[in-house]
Amino acid sequence: MSDAPTKWRIKSARTVYSNRWITVREYQTVAPTGADALYGLVHMHNLALGVLPIDEQGRTILVGQQRFPFGRYSWELPEGGGLPEITPLEGAQRELAEEAGLKAGSWLQLVGDMHMSNSVTDERAYAFLAWGLSEDHSFAKDSSEELSVRRVSFAEALKRADSGEITDAFTLVMLYKADHLLRTGGLPEELAKLMQAQT
């Protein structure tokens, strides 16, 4: 599909707030319709990175933590922010080690350059499937995070997504994309066998 011919035009911009993770900018713009419009944009300094790990028994790993914006506990796949000076894969490898204490011998990109909430933020996301897992405690955990880690079958993780127990959008995308690839023959045979082991 082609892009729309008319783009937004920026008349002026100012930084409203900034810290090490985000910058909030306010724009005076002309919309594609020609109307003047005020636009607020949250610029993310890091990439969003996620990992769907599969162990030798066909289980994946859910990480539980208290999420500040909604004031509730959330079960998610390992995910976090990736520094801009390293590749998405390197960042995902670090997240898997930090949150789950694991490394993987095999990696497959699951999602590339996904726009997380493109009406208000420029956050971009990459996600990977990881298998051939072994322990890796070379990275210290984030001091602001108190994490719980559980291993569940891939099928059980999907059930928790279907039931609404899992609400994190990035986790839902990873689970459903992996399930689609599993059903359509888009995964390496060894990985597919692991994921189907407990279905």
What do the predicted segments below correspond to?
Residues 2-8, 73, 84, 110, ...:
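Nudix hydrolase/Nudix homology domain
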Residues 3-7, 42-45, 50-94, 98, ...:
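Conserved Nudix-box catalytic region and its N-terminal flanking loop in Nudix hydrolases
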Residues 12-50, 56:
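Acidic, metal-coordinating catalytic segment for phosphate/diphosphate chemistry
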Residues 23, 43-46, 55-57, 67, ...:
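Active-site segment of metal-dependent pyrophosphate-handling enzymes
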Residues 26-28, 53, 129-131, 151-153:
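Short, well-ordered beta-strand micro-motif
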